[in-house]
């Protein structure tokens, strides 16, 4: 997992408008239930419009940004210039060289990003560890050469943060269509040991209720019996970080469940609340 790109949501609006300066009744396009729920809570006066299509097609819905659809023409009959703004992911726009269309990079404290937003994951098949490692890199290479090569680009802090975010999502039995946000980060904690912090939100689709939690876990210092061995100390720290990240994500999810997040309409699948309460029916 390479280093994370900008995890924030991006407002792309006409005339340089921001979330705070969009006029009452402004039409804002997004295809994300998470963004819809938070926008309804933040700016209930806005008109939210469900949109689909690639990045260029979505930008073409905003006056002044239609030119970015020149090399990817919109489908016949697709609206153009009918919205005041659209919300996309900063990371995607940055990677496409379209950062200049962003009129506001929305603070995660204002709009919590999706779990894993801005992060990329590289996967290989188990059998490729031997086949590619030997056939492509070096016919005489030992099994696991490709895996070792990929580890060189792995950013531990990003990997740990995304592990925590996805642990929360998994515990809530939710997917990308649920109005759930989570952002974690690794910081310097006490006595030189790292701390993992997480801010997360779960909302009703209509924005009528937004649950928000911030929590953290402080790791212990590296044990004295391995502190003198850099390799052993690093291995201990890595193992401890991932275990703590998983536990933090589950802990925050459990807090949401205790608050009734699984009972919010259109939010997450019914999960075991541990109190004998019935689970709501799964949404269609």
Regions found by a protein language model. Give the residues of each.
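Small-molecule-sensing regulatory modules
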Residues: 45, 49-284
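A conserved helix-loop-strand patch within extracytoplasmic ligand-binding domains
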Residues: 1-45, 129
């Amino acid at each position: 997992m390479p280093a994370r790109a900008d995890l924030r949501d991006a407002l792309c609006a006409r005339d340089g408008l921001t979330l705070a300066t969009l006029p009452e009744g402004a039409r804002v396009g997004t295809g994300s239930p998470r963004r819809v729920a938070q926008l309804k809570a933040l700016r209930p006066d806005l008109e939210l419009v469900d949109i689909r299509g690639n990045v260029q097609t979505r930008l073409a819905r905003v006056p002044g940004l239609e030119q970015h659809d020149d090399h990817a023409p919109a489908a016949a009959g697709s609206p153009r210039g009918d919205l005041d703004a659209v919300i996309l992911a900063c990371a995607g726009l940055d990677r496409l060289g379209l950062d200049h269309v962003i009129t506001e990079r929305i603070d995660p404290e204002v709009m919590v990003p999706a779990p894993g937003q801005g992060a990329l994951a590289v996967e290989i098949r188990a059998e490729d560890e031997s086949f590619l490692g030997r056939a492509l890199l070096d016919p005489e290479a030992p099994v696991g050469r490709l895996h070792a090569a990929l580890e060189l680009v792995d950013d531990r802090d990003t990997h740990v943060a995304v592990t925590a975010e996805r642990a929360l999502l998994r515990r809530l039995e939710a997917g990308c269509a649920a109005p759930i946000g989570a952002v974690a980060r690794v910081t310097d904690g006490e006595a030189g040991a790292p701390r993992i912090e997480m801010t997360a939100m779960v909302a009703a689709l209509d924005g009528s209720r937004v649950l928000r939690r911030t929590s953290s876990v402080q790791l212990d210092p590296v044990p004295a019996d391995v502190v003198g061995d850099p390799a052993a100390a690093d291995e201990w720290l890595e193992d401890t970080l991932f275990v703590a990240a998983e536990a933090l994500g589950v802990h925050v999810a459990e807090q949401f469940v205790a608050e009734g997040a699984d009972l919010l309409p259109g939010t997450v699948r019914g999960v075991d609340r541990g109190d004998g309460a019935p689970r709501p029916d799964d949404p269609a």
